[in-house]
């Protein structure tokens, strides 16, 4: 009987102090969640600023790369259509209307210039 009374008294004390600690635990949980949200917010802000910096660097690199990779326009070879809507003929060729292609496709072609 004495042991039951001791265990019941321990149960009552544990329940009483357990409730008190529960309030403290709730306060601690609130503080932890607030700190976590604060840290997450700061981490998000840092990540966003990092993304903005990377985008600025990427823009600068692409501007330099676009200027560096620009090539001269390609030229058309022999027996290729030329004119206003096409690329110019390569050196050594001239854009002329010929009997073989011009009358059928109605456009001049790049050919070796005639001497006559």
Curated annotation (Swiss-Prot):
Entry superkingdom: Eukaryota
GO MF term list: sodium channel inhibitor activity; toxin activity
Domain notes: The presence of a 'disulfide through disulfide knot' structurally defines this protein as a knottin.
Signal peptide, first to last residue: 1-20
Keywords: Cleavage on pair of basic residues, Disulfide bond, Ion channel impairing toxin, Knottin, Secreted, Signal, Toxin
Protein name per UniProt: U16-barytoxin-Tl1a
Localization terms from the record: Secreted
A Pfam family hit: Toxin_22
InterPro entries in the record: Toxin_22
Tissue: Expressed by the venom gland.
Disulfide bond annotation, renumbered to this chain: 75-90, 82-95, 89-110
One GO cellular component term: extracellular region
Origin species: Trittame loki
Key word Secreted present: yes
Annotated family: Belongs to the neurotoxin 14 (magi-1) family. 06 (ICK-Trit) subfamily.
Biological role stated in the UniProt entry: Ion channel inhibitor.
